[in-house]
Amino acid sequence: MAHALVTFRDVAIDFSQKEWECLDTTQRKLYRDVMLENYNNLVSLGYSGSKPDVITLLEQGKEPCVVARDVTGRQCPGLLSRHKTKKLSSEKDIHEISLSKESIIEKSKTLRLKGSIFRNEWQNKSEFEGQQGLKERSISQKKIVSKKMSTDRKRPSFTLNQRIHNSEKSCDSHLVQHGKIDSDVKHDCKECGSTFNNVYQLTLHQKIHTGEKSCKCEKCGKVFSHSYQLTLHQRFHTGEKPYECQECGKTFTLYPQLNRHQKIHTGKKPYMCKKCDKGFFSRLELTQHKRIHTGKKSYECKECGKVFQLIFYFKEHERIHTGKKPYECKECGKAFSVCGQLTRHQKIHTGVKPYECKECGKTFRLSFYLTEHRRTHAGKKPYECKECGKSFNVRGQLNRHKTIHTGIKPFACKVCEKAFSYSGDLRVHSRIHTGEKPYECKECGKAFMLRSVLTEHQRLHTGVKPYECKECGKTFRVRSQISLHKKIHTDVKPYKCVRCGKTFRFGFYLTEHQRIHTGEKPYKCKECGKAFIRRGNLKEHLKIHSGLKPYDCKECGKSFSRRGQFTEHQKIHTGVKPYKCKECGKAFSRSVDLRIHQRIHTGEKPYECKQCGKAFRLNSHLTEHQRIHTGEKPYECKVCRKAFRQYSHLYQHQKTHNVI
């Protein structure tokens, strides 16, 4: 068994303050990724020392450089001072780890790989630096590393592109060794006039103008300007996600992604907008949000005129018009124009829903679905339309609503020329012409055009009714049903019938009611020719011909063709009668029964005969009365062929034949 003395110093990457200032934002993010991953690998080898300050700062997303000291003495926590270097020799920070030679070599390869990413970038930088001292430092450093690797044959080496300092030398001498960097010298780009602190940053910037991309991915052919970008990109092909959230188990390709994700669980939003006091998880989100106040939108689509704040979103949008979908699901072959859409789609196959609502226990595949769902409990509607003041739970709902005011509909159907504001709406609409129903119920085989309709349908089988009325406790399968139901408690009825003065909570109720006066029955049964005022009545009627009775009572086994009949029947077993008359105290199991009963007290008779002017409380009474004028007798006795206007009369007659 081989024994190796491994310290955090062996896998740390050190920079002076001036060297740190030369790194751009992307390089600093890479430094954070490499340092954290190396430390995690060291812990997996058995390192049990106290967590270094630099790791704590990096995990918190803070700047790792200490600013309390003067310019020549400042250093990053990765740069060890004489005091800290001596401290490493104590038993507290050096641990003897018993590992097999093979396992050490395997981990060593991983650490070298992570360090090499950063080493290549830093060595590239030294090629552009004009300071001779920095070049000499780079050469001497390579010699030291080479010497260390050749002499430490017995002990496996974990050396990356480390800066190995003599503990007897001061930090000032260390800075001299690394070369002097004159921060006063500015370098201007001749193309656009941008100014940079050093030649390296200028050279990287100029690649934007030249379009130079020297690093190519062998898997997909995508090219990158920097080697570290290629290395990070390759993780998408390998599927490597080394950073795992301990709260929900979700894994990430980069540490900053994990850091941003963890803020979802903590609820911490450290980046505040000074204009509206809105909080955000990341600085990027805040930057994007600020453009709402400034109105800056620089990228315009030539096809439809839509403008975007970021070029990233603009390029994604362009794929809608070109039809390009480069991201394909390996499970089902479905392709997507945006990588994020593929990532979300893949969770359908895994079935993983790690985000759970603490209020109702409902789980979601994506965190923002949970965030949107929570607003239903809190009653929050943070997205307000500036045109009409209407508020929404979800930003997407607001964006859809805005098209009402703008009237822009750039996506037209090629079959019927109907136009839509969103490509997704057009895609769904096209299924009407193609007959495509991609969402199938595994229980009964019924297929649907929309996933949301399938989800609602599946609740018929599961019996789940997640939407509960806080006023009366009644539950519903569909959100739209509870929205309609809530208006029962408000008593607001803004829709009034001009003929009889009756008021309704909803416009479509008024439309259906007006057919009573006009006699219009647009929904006709193809089997028997019977017509109906409402589509729902026709659908229920069709079940008579099919003999289908899908609603079974678990208490007594009785089956029903209509859901309404089934719901009414269940109240026999429960005895629940939530609708009470304020006049006489009589209670009813259905609101419609209460409404009909109240006409006894009010004297209301909305159904009037056009022949003689007689009025009735119920539409069925009017129908029976009209048969006096028409002479219609639809109920015939099968024994003697005598016919009757009302079913009750036939029932009484059949007793004479001893049929009943």
UniProtKB/Swiss-Prot annotation:
Concerning PROSITE patterns, the annotation shows: KRAB (PS50805), ZINC_FINGER_C2H2_1 (PS00028), ZINC_FINGER_C2H2_2 (PS50157)
Q: Where is this cross-link: Glycyl lysine isopeptide (Lys-Gly) (interchain with G-Cter in SUMO2)?
A: 109
One GO term under biological process is: regulation of transcription by RNA polymerase II
Tell me the compartments it is located in.
Answer: Nucleus; Cytoplasm
How does it associate, per the subunit comment?
Answer: May interact with MVP.
Q: What does this protein do?
A: May act as a transcriptional repressor.
Q: What is this protein called?
A: Zinc finger protein 540
